[in-house]
Amino acid sequence: MQKIMTFLMFPSGLEEAVKRYVSTFEKYGSRIVSTGKGPDGKVNSAEFVLAGQTFLSFEGGPHFSFSDGISLFIRCETQEEVDELWTRLSADGGKELDCGWVQDKWGVRWQVVPKILNELLSSPDRERAGRAVQAMLKMKKLDIAGLKKAADGN
């Protein structure tokens, strides 16, 4: 059993958000574990799994909101994976942010990051790493080819 779990308190839209997340990450073994309903019959709590990570969530009302202080980090293997997840998470009113960040329509912040970025940023060649950082700072959705090209000085 997972000892530490992420808990998300949604201001509204919990049921729709959970369904969207499970659908977005379906091919990674995602599912809804359980839901609870309030007196009004609406789903107000949920436990769900995204790519092996268990989340707990409540719909707490308008005095709750998400912030840049925490984000969900997705390590992507390919550009196709970056593109697909970026598109799904930014859909229907989401916002494309800088440096690989996207805010979904419920306000949750996600970092959609290609695995190679860590390799580029931790390069022992600090100039190469610096060029990768400068390229990343100019991007919204991260582009693997663009990051590599910049790191290589092209």
Feature names for model-found ranges:
Residues 8-52:
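Core segments of cupin and vicinal oxygen chelate
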